[in-house]
Amino acid sequence: MIYKDFFEDTIELTDERWQHIIKEHPELKPYKERIIEVLLKPDYVKRSTRDSEVLLYYKFYGDIFLGKPMLVVVKKGLRSFVLTCYITDVIKKGVTLWERK
């Protein structure tokens, strides 16, 4: 599936990556549509400290996962795609590219 992110860039979520996400993080299976929402309406976007071509999109949901943020990890490039998605306890270090005020 092809989506647009907050920056109007095209992001792909392949079937292979979706299968990886639900295998490693089965609690996310009912929340595929939230991945799209995180990309479009993030609370934070950070650049990874490990890979400058990786962006970290965070969104807090009060109604699921005890308010912990959902993190969608995207590899940017000629073909940008979702690497993974999971629930996290912390906002990782890195340059903040955007923050909801």
What positions do the PLM features span?
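Ribonuclease/tRNase effector modules and their secretory precursors
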Residues: 1-101
